[in-house]
From Swiss-Prot:
GO terms for molecular function: structural constituent of ribosome. GO terms for biological process: translation. It comes from the Bacteria. The keyword Ribosomal protein applies. It comes from Trichodesmium erythraeum (strain IMS101). This is Large ribosomal subunit protein bL17. Coiled coil: none annotated. Keywords: Ribonucleoprotein, Ribosomal protein. Part of the 50S ribosomal subunit. Contacts protein L32. InterPro entries: Ribosomal_bL17, Ribosomal_bL17_CS, Ribosomal_bL17_sf. GO terms for cellular component: cytosolic large ribosomal subunit. The gene is rplQ. Belongs to the bacterial ribosomal protein bL17 family.
């Protein structure tokens, strides 16, 4: 039974899973949208929402937490500069997951996750 198992495992050890989510979050914020598998998209969605909420806060502590999570320092600065004007009136729901066709090789469910 999966009682209180809230973290999607994604078939990886903890360190690889964290690195994967950090990388996906960095790429999503950089490019605005990425195409990945549906479970990965759902997992990275909460991480990106957390980073945008930190950027809306705008404090020095929030900036340092984002710098510790995302891989690109310049990307953090641009996120903090534009987050307030882009997402100022929104209370969450900064990303959207759209289902797309299944992957040809292994028939995995694919999804496009994008920033709103």
């Amino acid at each position: 039974m999966r009682h209180s198992c809230r973290v999607p495992k994604l078939g990886k050890p903890t360190d690889q899973r964290r690195a994967l989510l950090r990388s996906l979050a960095t790429q999503l914020i950089r490019h605005g949208q990425i195409k990945t598998t549906k479970p990965r998209a759902k997992a990275v969605q909460s991480e990106v929402e957390r980073m945008i909420t930190l950027a809306k806060d705008g404090s020095l502590a929030a900036r340092r937490r984002a710098l510790g999570y995302l891989y690109d320092k310049k990307l953090v600065h641009s996120l903090f500069n534009e987050a307030q004007e882009r997402y100022g009136s929104r209370n969450g729901g900064y990303t959207r997951v759209l289902r797309t066709i299944r992957r040809r090789g292994d028939n995995a469910e694919m999804a496009i996750i994008e920033l709103i």
